[in-house]
Amino acid sequence: LQEKSCTDFQLAVDDYLIRHRSILDVLTKHQEAAARVNRAVAKAVTECGCISIVAERQKIPADAEFNNLKAFMSSHLSGELCENCRDVLINELGHSLFYLTALCNLTGLDLQAVLQHETKNVRTLGIFNLS
């Protein structure tokens, strides 16, 4: 997100988060929203079938070099989201982002600063970040 978009979104969330303003509400709503993201992906697989999951052990050649590992790693995802499933997933990701931003607001964190901090960490740590 660009800085102005982050700021605008954070201000909008602050303006419109009224009913579930308690930190406990925000934490549980964020968790619920994350579960709905997972469910949207699962439904795209099991009900629509526009995508499928073909999971197996990652096949990495013994002589593969560390800096080339990404080329051998699979997402286990096959196909592309149809328009309907894409819309559902975008909607659910939006709700998740809404409550993540609400959590930032209630704890006094700037969403843009969080994104910049994490971007710096990812770039600094490279492939060792969250691996």
Report each predicted region and the residues it spans:
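Flexible "arm" and connector segments at domain edges
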Residues: 1-93, 97-131
